[in-house]
Amino acid sequence: MQTWTDEGEEIPLTGGDVTEGLVRLGDTVRRPRGERWELVRAVLTHLESVGFEGAPRFLGVDSAGREVLSYIDGEVAGRPRPPWIADEDRMISVARLLRAYDDAVAGFGIPSDLPPPIEPPGLPELDDPPELVGHQDITPENVVFRDGRAFALIDFDLARPVSRAREVVNLLLWWAPLGADEDLDPELRGLDRPRRCRHIADAYGLSRPDRLRVMELAIALNERAWHLMKYRAETLGGGWQRMWDEGVGDKIKSRQTWLEENADSITTALTS
């Protein structure tokens, strides 16, 4: 077990869109406990027990009540995006890392005592039985690279019971990526999205039944995303409100149109 101390200089870290108060202290990361921090602790403890190296170690809770995690050295694709963000070999390595994570976490099961998710009125229903506790936030900021390959996943705040197909939808969203060029980072525009989706599905090892339904699932999840983002902005504020004010709702609706227009070509690429 890695030892740690509360002494030393705290260095602020750039988190994702909604994580605030993230700091590095020595060889550890301190982060405020989220609403599902106990699930995160249990998942990270399980991953350590099965020898999965691609995630932080949960070390405890400090005197300020923050989670203490091991710091994983490497590079992440913050903003502005680095030129290598569109590199297909890196993209494929992310898919392989996610598959390794999903295989490792599958033995953890799905806890029976998890509180039901808080869902806003009018949220479209989703028929997609969960298989494992997925990461569900495979953004460029949450993948640590070493020597040009994805080494570890960080930030498990959105971990929840999902299907493998839903994990791949999240992966495609950020790394294909899914959406109209004008809504993407400049470094990710003009790419052959159907081909990249196929590479991701192949690297992950997505089953044929899941390949046939993954775009239908992406459309359904994107529709739900608009309702969830609006609800979180209204009830949680903070980073959620900032993203909503910056137009994320409009981008989600634009992506919905793009998904519907491109679903057939991507499904063909995934299954041919």
Show the residue positions of the predicted features:
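Actinobacteria-biased recognition of intrinsically disordered, low-complexity terminal regions
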Residues: 1-18, 261-272
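ATP-binding pocket architecture of kinase catalytic cores
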Residues: 9-135, 146-149
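Short, polar/flexible loop-turn hinges at active-site or ligand-entry regions and domain interfaces
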Residues: 80-84, 160-162, 179-184
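Amphipathic alpha-helical interface surfaces
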Residues: 97, 146, 164-167, 193-197, ...
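Catalytic activation segment of kinase domains across protein kinase-like and atypical kinase folds
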Residues: 117, 122-128, 132, 139-178
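Active-site activation/catalytic loop segments of kinase-like enzymes and analogous catalytic loops
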Residues: 168-205, 221-235
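Short, surface-exposed acidic
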Residues: 206-216
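ATP/Mg2+ or Mg2+-diphosphate-binding catalytic cores
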Residues: 225-272
